[in-house]
Amino acid sequence: MSPKTPASKGRTRGRNAGRGVGSASHSASGGRSTAQQHRQWLGLVDTEGPFLSVPVLTDLYPQGIPGMSRERREVLRAAKPALDRAWDTWDADRDSEATLTSYRHARDAWVDTVLTEVLGWDGLWTTAQDRPVLAETYRAASDGIQAVTVTPTGALMRGEEVGALVLVTDPADSLREVGQDGWATSPIDRVAAMLRAPGSTCSIGVVTDGRWWAMVSAPREGSAASGVVDCQTWVEEPATREAFCELLSVRRLVGGTAAHRLPRLFEDSVLAAEEVTE
């Protein structure tokens, strides 16, 4: 089930494919400090740029990342096998349009389940098809006469507030791979470009091909950062699953106070790193 080439470069470990959804038990963390727990799951994320820092995470989650509810784990357990089968079929015959079409159907169902039922975006998840203004506002394009244009698949929205953009892509070995459509950028780069569109009011994005999931931070001022996780490792590494789902929950994107939302966590992480450097 492993792809033919590594998913991404750098720090990612635990890439062996899993086939279900494990429990939310944190018994393995016994005897370790909260900072060590955060450091461990961060070490399993393929990060690039100024990603979330251990001090900031420890301050917000002094007891560690909260576990996922049993109901949400059951939703994942029921939905994941269909995605696994579709990926395997596509991976065995990558040049077939039929297998790609079949994979897209399975991917879309899986992504919808993760966003609405696992992350809890139900009622707030809005597609660009339903809200054309998303495509108009967050459009990004390459330079040149024959420009390649990309728009978000949808977004988490509360009223007119955009909490996170979402881009769903075709299957690939890595979300950091440069596209083959004439624009020499990766899906992650394209999300960053959309987040920095002239009319953007959002700095957080999510990009996925179904298997790989990336969290992207791209403030208008400052460096972009991203972290990629493999949903196949959500079995043997539930801590990364729970951290990913908690950080992309409604309360971290459009709920609570701004000081406890994901954009501020990225901002504070940059400041913390600068203080250490000084």
PLM region descriptions:
Residues W110, G120, A155-L156, P171, ...:
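Generic ordered-secondary-structure signal
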Residues M1-T101, G159-E278:
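Short, basic/polar, glycine-containing "phosphate-handling" surface segments that engage DNA
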Residues E97-L134:
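Acidic-basic catalytic patches of nuclease active cores, encompassing PD-(D/E)XK
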